[in-house]
């Protein structure tokens, strides 16, 4: 989700960038240790069609290490401080419609 946010920001779609970071989906959650909760349906199980997506009640976890908190920090830092070629717009990765107030201090632009 942070990769989608950074891509959307660079494409001049800051609302989509924020929406990607805040997307409510089971795989865009963070555990206390910073990992992303990669949950899957148990073998043979089906998602509850009434819910529209698998619920977090399923406990089958994928055995992988995904430190998503680092990606989240990189994405928000880039969205706030900018990147080479961003036109020197303040907080270019956030909508400039009054819905966000962004203050940045000491974070350099990404290439």
Where are these regions (language model features)?
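Alpha-helical support elements that line or immediately flank enzyme active sites
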Residues: 1-14
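Non-catalytic C-terminal accessory modules of carbohydrate-active enzymes
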Residues: 15-111
């Amino acid at each position: 989700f942070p990769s989608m946010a950074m891509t959307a920001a660079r494409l001049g779609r800051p609302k989509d960038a924020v929406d990607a970071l805040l997307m409510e989906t089971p795989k865009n959650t963070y555990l206390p240790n910073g990992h992303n909760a990669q949950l899957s349906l148990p073998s043979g199980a089906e998602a509850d069609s009434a819910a529209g997506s698998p619920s977090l009640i399923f406990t089958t976890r994928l055995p992988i290490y995904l430190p998503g908190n680092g990606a989240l920090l990189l994405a928000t830092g880039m969205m706030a401080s900018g990147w080479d070629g961003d036109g020197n717009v303040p907080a270019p990765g956030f909508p400039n419609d009054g819905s966000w107030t962004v203050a940045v201090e000491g974070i350099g632009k990404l290439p």
